[in-house]
């Protein structure tokens, strides 16, 4: 496999640095959409409460709130580079970001608990709703990370 990509030509004039924000935003949107698509599919396929407890949607809602909280704070506000201090300043931005990450990790851990505690350990015939809850939260979590850290704020330099 040493010469696998040697025949393909990548354009040298293609500047991926200028398109970084676009690519990261599209990738994060696709991940977020895929997460909600999976859980909607599970809710439609298993509408009865004994097959899929619909209170499990709470994890996805909390993951979505965490997604919004994480991305509401810019990296400049966390570093203290912004021109205005805002409502609580740099410390408030860091606390807000920390709470957002706590909610994101908490919803991901809760979705694993739902998968294993509610479907695998009970040896249910249908495990797909538990897998759907986990993948929904995983996709939303990774979409939030891509949207937060995949973009850059220094377009003018």
UniProtKB/Swiss-Prot annotation:
Subcellular location: Membrane
Primary location group: membrane
Transmembrane intervals: 26-46, 58-78, 95-115, 126-146
InterPro entries listed in its UniProt record: UPF0220
Disulfide links within the chain: none
GO-annotated cellular components: cytoplasm; endoplasmic reticulum; glial cell projection; membrane; neuronal cell body
Post-translational modification Phosphoserine, affected residues: 2
Keywords: Acetylation, Membrane, Phosphoprotein, Transmembrane, Transmembrane helix
Modified residues (N-acetylserine): 2
Topology in the lipid bilayer: Multi-pass membrane protein
PANTHER family from the UniProt entry: SMALL MEMBRANE PROTEIN-RELATED (PTHR13180)
UniProt record similarity statement: Belongs to the UPF0220 family.
Protein name in the entry: Transmembrane protein 50A
Organism: Mus musculus
